[in-house]
Amino acid sequence: MKPDIKICGLKTPEAIDRALKRGATHIGFIFFEKSPRYIEPDLAAKLAEPARGKAKIVAVVVDPTNDELDEIVSLLKPDILQLHGNESPEHVLTIKALYGLPVMKVFSVRTAADLKRVEAYIGIADRFLFDAKAPKGSELPGGNGISFDWSLLSWLDGSIDYMLSGGLNKDNVANALANTTARGIDVSSGVESAPGVKSVAMIDEFFDAVEGADAPVMASGS
């Protein structure tokens, strides 16, 4: 079973075109102004057009206001909302009800304690994404190019649908797939030549590494 592959933080038609040609199942646009991958909703909407019907369009937000979500959803018309902040289970339910869109809830992980919140979102969020917790002093909740100990996810038996993120690149993605039950992988900084600058060549290398992975995607965690 092939994993879903999400290329996140896209800002150029060239990177989107290559991601689609290589088989990306999801493309992500980041609406967090402190990120080097930030994009205005109207530009994201234009760039997303070639992807409609080919890949899921994901809007990545961090503790958004209702006005911010209204603008993003109205212009981009995303398939999925990715919540990367401190949104409570109740807030997730409210957002789902308001926009009628599936939600992918992100959890930032460094230790086992960071995963204690997950249970409260089971049956509420449509999918989870596990990312590495930002280093001290960083203003970015994700896209920091660091990984976490994947063995912390060993309690996930495959019944919970999640994507794996956090420092993934061509050199470690095969191990990530072999040692977790992730049904999808999310990459951003791992296909960049500089923060916020996607490299077409690195996108190719990442897909080559996924396609060359020897281990089955649904291998049990360790």
Swiss-Prot record:
What's the Enzyme Commission number for this chain? 5.3.1.24
Q: Specify the protein name.
A: N-(5'-phosphoribosyl)anthranilate isomerase
**Which GO terms of the molecular function aspect are on file?**
phosphoribosylanthranilate isomerase activity
The organism's superkingdom is given as: Bacteria
Which reactions appear under catalytic activity for this entry? N-(5-phospho-beta-D-ribosyl)anthranilate = 1-(2-carboxyphenylamino)-1-deoxy-D-ribulose 5-phosphate
Give the pathway annotation.
Answer: Amino-acid biosynthesis; L-tryptophan biosynthesis; L-tryptophan from chorismate: step 3/5
Q: Which family does it belong to?
A: Belongs to the TrpF family.
SUPFAM superfamilies named among the record's database cross-references: Ribulose-phoshate binding barrel
UniProt entry keywords in alphabetical sequence? Amino-acid biosynthesis, Aromatic amino acid biosynthesis, Isomerase, Tryptophan biosynthesis
Cite a single Pfam family from the UniProt record.
PRAI
The main enzyme category here is isomerase
Q: Where does the chain cross the membrane?
A: none
Question: Which gene codes for it?
Answer: trpF
Q: Which GO BP terms, alphabetically?
A: L-tryptophan biosynthetic process
